[in-house]
Amino acid sequence: MATKNEEILRKPDWLKIKLNTNENYTGLKKMMRKKNLNTVCEEAKCPNIHECWGARRTATFMILGAVCTRACRFCAVKTGLPNELDLNEPERVAESVELMNLKHVVITAVARDDLRDAGSNVYAETVRKVRERNPFTTIEILPSDMGGDYDALETLMASRPDILNHNIETVRRLTPRVRARATYDRTLEFLRRSKELQPDIPTKSSIMVGLGETIEEIYETMDDLRANDVDILTIGQYLQPSRKHLKVQKYYTPLEFGKLRKVAMDKGFKHCQAGPLVRSSYHADEQVNEAAKEKQRQGEAQLNS
């Protein structure tokens, strides 16, 4: 039983979601099982899975296995000793994207600190295979910090994704508690170097709120991201995946998220999604640059012809 100091906050009404289990959703779920693929949508218990899979024709594949070498205190993904790399995974991901006619695909990965290249070669090959089979699908990558291995980052950026997404997750003060194996400054450097390697590829990051940060700390984090040339920001409510994870300290209202979005845009971000259910990949198909949007339009025209 929780003590007064550990009391669990009641989830507000605005966090209730409408389930959408149409053909897109059920078809994609069957495809993932058939191809033996993982999605962060399922593994991380994302609240938007029904909207993205069911209505938007977008999905987030999680590659390099389903077991992460880290144990961040906010994350529902399994941790432990990972399996051997599956070298056929890039082709299976590419086939699945093609079969589902996905408009936008996000490719994320568990952290593989056990691998010399942090998994970057298989990751880059996945991007290339998806691009070969799906020239009109926009591709976003969401890697770990790869242990600060910038040769691995260079390998990954050479695959030319449409967006590089790497999440700061929380404010500087809370980072050691929330994700002990990462550092705030390494995340900023990873984002800065990504832009230096491929200046025309938009960079993106995400902040979870509700972990005990102050508004001033959120604004400081926005400033740090802009100082490292980050283009796109998403801000969402932290939700506790299980009793083992960090507790929610505050539920922000939709009005508060609206204010955060306005501040972010005033600070110079090109795009900001902010809301209680917003996650890193939420409405990601809208956040690509104009060149990538033209690819999406060509794909839609082909699909409807």
Swiss-Prot record:
Reaction it catalyzes: [[Fe-S] cluster scaffold protein carrying a second [4Fe-4S](2+) cluster] + N(6)-octanoyl-L-lysyl-[protein] + 2 oxidized [2Fe-2S]-[ferredoxin] + 2 S-adenosyl-L-methionine + 4 H(+) = [[Fe-S] cluster scaffold protein] + N(6)-[(R)-dihydrolipoyl]-L-lysyl-[protein] + 4 Fe(3+) + 2 hydrogen sulfide + 2 5'-deoxyadenosine + 2 L-methionine + 2 reduced [2Fe-2S]-[ferredoxin]
Keyword Methyltransferase appears in the UniProt entry: no
Essential cofactor(s): [4Fe-4S] cluster
The gene coding this protein: lipA
Localisation per UniProt entry: Cytoplasm
Biased composition (Basic and acidic residues): 283-298
Listed EC numbers: 2.8.1.8
Binding of [4Fe-4S] cluster 2, residues: C68, C72, C75
Database matches in SUPFAM superfamilies: Radical SAM enzymes
Residue ranges occupied by any Radical SAM core domain in the UniProt entry: 54-270
Region (Disordered): 283-305
GO terms for cellular component: cytoplasm
Record InterPro entries: Aldolase_TIM, Elp3/MiaA/NifB-like_rSAM, LIAS_N, Lipoyl_synth, rSAM
Key words, A-Z: 4Fe-4S, Cytoplasm, Iron, Iron-sulfur, Metal-binding, S-adenosyl-L-methionine, Transferase
Species the sequence originates in: Staphylococcus aureus (strain bovine RF122 / ET3-1)
NCBIfam families: lipA, PRK05481.1, PRK12928.1
Family per similarity comment: Belongs to the radical SAM superfamily. Lipoyl synthase family.
Pathway annotation: Protein modification; protein lipoylation via endogenous pathway; protein N(6)-(lipoyl)lysine from octanoyl-[acyl-carrier-protein]
Name of protein: Lipoyl synthase
Single Gene Ontology MF annotation: lipoate synthase activity
Species lineage: Bacteria, Bacillati, Bacillota, Bacilli, Bacillales
Positions that bind [4Fe-4S] cluster 1: C41, C46, C52, S281
Transmembrane intervals: none
Cofactor binding: number and manner: Binds 2 [4Fe-4S] clusters per subunit. One cluster is coordinated with 3 cysteines and an exchangeable S-adenosyl-L-methionine.
Glycosyltransferase in keyword set: no
